Amino acid sequence: MDKLILSELTNGLNTVWMLLAAMLVFFMQPGFALVEAGFTRVKNTANILMKNFVDFMFGSLLYWFIGFGLMFGAGGFIGMPHFFDLSFYDGGGLPTEGFLVFQTVFCATAATIVSGAMAERTKFSMYLVYTIFISVLIYPVSGHWTWGGGWLMNGEAGSFMMETFGTTFHDFAGSTIVHSVGGWIALVGAAILGPRIGKYGKDGKSRAIPGHNLTIAALGVFILWFGWFLSLIHI
């Protein structure tokens, strides 16, 4: 009986801690929005803010619809889709719905990282297409390789990781699954789009394009610090 009570108490505390971390990561969304809006020109503020809303609004539904199954379903390279069905997942004592929320906010974070790198030169409709791809394919598949128990986490004898490196891959605090994925996509997007109009003169020298509000940009940075460092304690 004592072990049962202790187990239930542990699961309850773990659930509270997981949801607290999810709320902190979600709180990073307004941080990203403020940073990006503050460092861009006032005429593009509405576009930047709307893209951050779209990341979460559409991304959360799409991730729930198909992304969660691809990330945590059975399979080595990619999981099996389970459309709006969470019954396949065993949370190990944690509620599956809570874990879905936890993963959803990380998916939104990976998507939002790209927004700032392509600010002021991306059509809203094309950004919506990108949001769909990262929410239902890019983040879930790369996440399945590690957090979903895919081939990078396969520690069985004879597996690729064990034969090649003698150990499995370890992702610390989403440094690869979240930030590296978002960063690489941002790099590719910025390279394809090129610089903002007016950034370089005819002589090739760069011109400063100051943001319209450094105050809200600084506030956004502090919000990001707050959300990231406190959620890092959980991860």
Predicted regions and their residues:
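Hydrophobic alpha-helical transmembrane bundles of multi-pass membrane proteins
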Residues: 1-233
